[in-house]
Every structure is written in C-alpha cells, then in structure tokens.
C-alpha cells in the first residue's frame, strides 16, 4: 500500500508506516504523476484535490484532510470515483480558541480596557466557534452566537442575526468557506458591512481569508476611521494583499490552529478513520505520542483576575511572537508558506498543570489542567 502525505503532516510515519510505504510530497505543488500508484492520500488545506490532481490516481481508495475545512476538496469527484473521504472536524478547535483569547488579551493590554463585560459576536458556532465562545465566557465576555444553519437545524442554543452580531464590541469569524447557497460565506464581510462598522470595534478572522473582502478592508483601513484587526487568514494565500498587513494590530500566516496538539490530532483523526475504513484495530493513543511540554507545571499563589490570567496564558502562548515573525518576514518571496512549514512548537494550555489552592474555575474553563483545588 502506497500512502502519499503532505510533507508537513506530523506523525505520518508513526501512525501509517505499519500499513505501507509512506511518501511525503510538497502539498501546494502536488502533481497527478505523484499519485499515479497511490492507494491513500492525506493532505492539508494547501492541496486542491480535484479531477486534475486525481486524473492518474487509478488505485486511490481513500482521501483524508487533516483540517476542519473541506473547501479544497472536490467531494463530487471523489464520490464519482468511489473514493472514500474523511476530514478532521474539531482537530484544532482548542488551538484556534486559544489563539483568539491570546489575541484579545493583547488587544486589551494595548488599548487599556477590560474584556469582562464586553460583547463578542461569534460568527459560526461549529467546533471552533464554540471553543472560542466557551473560553470567552470564562473571561466574563458576553457571547452572542450567529449561525443560521445551526439555528435552522434546531440547535438549542440562543442565536442572533448577522446584523446583531456585527454590533458587538468584538467580532470573531469561524465559518467554513462556501460560495453558493443562501448562506454563502464568500465575502460574508463585504464592502457594505465593512464601511458600516464602528472604528472602535475589534474584528478577528481565523477561518478562511475569502470570508472577508480584503481589498474593501484595505480601503477602510486607509480611511480616517480604521478598524482594529486581528488577521490570521488572507485572501489568495500565499500571495496575500501585503498592503493590508501594516493596518492590522495582529497579523499571522494562517497558524491559529497550529498547536502541536492540533496538528497531531488532525493526523490522528485520519488514522482512526483509516483504521475504521479498512478494518484495522486502533493500537496507538494520541496522548502517548505527545512529548512533555517544556513548561508543564506551575504553582499559582494568587487569585485568577484578568492580569494573572493574561500572564499565564501568554507564558504558554503569546500571539505577539507570531505577529513579529510575520511582519519581519512577509515581504520576502515564499515566506508565507515557509513560516507555516517551519512554525515553532506551540503547546495548548492543557499541557500545563497548575497547582493552586485558590478558586480556579476560570482556569479549568479555559482548558488548563489544575490540581490542588
């Protein structure tokens, strides 16, 4: 069995080598010739899996993407060819949630305000949106969910309209990219909405770049009343609109979901689906594959107010480090993908156990491991 995987996918050999030959190839430049004798294909969001790519893949039986989004996969072609498909929904939801909270704490420090009591419109209440909402609520933020598809499907949570969500102090986007239908998300935030927003609002996008009209956003940012922006995703990656970067407060190269746990979890979910599809027993456990974090234990002697929480959170992950690297390198050719490929190891908050006798409800809700309370 020949298993072709994206060169940047972790754990591929550890999880799949027992089933056949694991061949790593660059995801963004993958060719039909490389899949000519492949049985299994495992990709990330940079690979467009379509009829052209699969034109020579006569042996292909299974395609998996280690991502939440599937807009890079032509599912109709896979169905037509009888190729089984799986994705990794929720694999990096914790990582994205922690990215957003880290960014909001940076903004609160930069502009001298408290997050508690502010309103947050979460556009898209799936895995990542829910993870953001849960963590924001733990900080005392009033969360308003907007997801017409989930609302129509009978989700029991309370929802608001898109227009109401856009009135919030903070607005975070967590929708998949779709270009057709009543609730298409391509340019969901278009010129009309961008121009109507208040200059003191903070907007965050860690979903897909095309959800925001980047050109219209640049025009707004060049006006007398720019918005406050946190951008992890961009239109036309990796050839992004470089002119927009200086007008953002936080800018990163599509790495919100790039915690070590998130990356490992994505590949592991494909391993589980592969085993189920082909009748193999799942013999490996994700926890056994994760290394011990460099910072894995802390003792806390203070109550967890917003200042203490910020210090703890940024000790584990401070988004400003990614922002600084991005601004330093983005003008160089090919650096967008290179920064993603060589992204430094980042751990989730659950990798740290905090010993404390204080009330640590917020820490538990945020995802830290807590002992002693």
From Swiss-Prot:
Catalyzes the oxidation of erythronate-4-phosphate to 3-hydroxy-2-oxo-4-phosphonooxybutanoate. Substrate binds at residues 45, 67, 258. SUPFAM superfamilies: Formate/glycerate dehydrogenase catalytic domain-like, NAD(P)-binding Rossmann-fold domains. It catalyses: 4-phospho-D-erythronate + NAD(+) = (R)-3-hydroxy-2-oxo-4-phosphooxybutanoate + NADH + H(+). The lineage of its organism: Bacteria, Pseudomonadati, Pseudomonadota, Gammaproteobacteria, Aeromonadales. It is found in: Cytoplasm. It comes from Tolumonas auensis (strain DSM 9187 / NBRC 110442 / TA 4). The gene is pdxB. This is Erythronate-4-phosphate dehydrogenase. Keywords: Cytoplasm, NAD, Oxidoreductase, Pyridoxine biosynthesis. NAD(+) binds at residues 147, 206-208, 232, 257. GO terms for biological process: pyridoxine biosynthetic process. Its EC number is 1.1.1.290. GO terms for cellular component: cytoplasm. The active site is at residues 208, 237, 254. Gene3D superfamilies: 3.30.1370.170, NAD(P)-binding Rossmann-like Domain (3.40.50.720). Homodimer. Pathway: Cofactor biosynthesis; pyridoxine 5'-phosphate biosynthesis; pyridoxine 5'-phosphate from D-erythrose 4-phosphate: step 2/5.
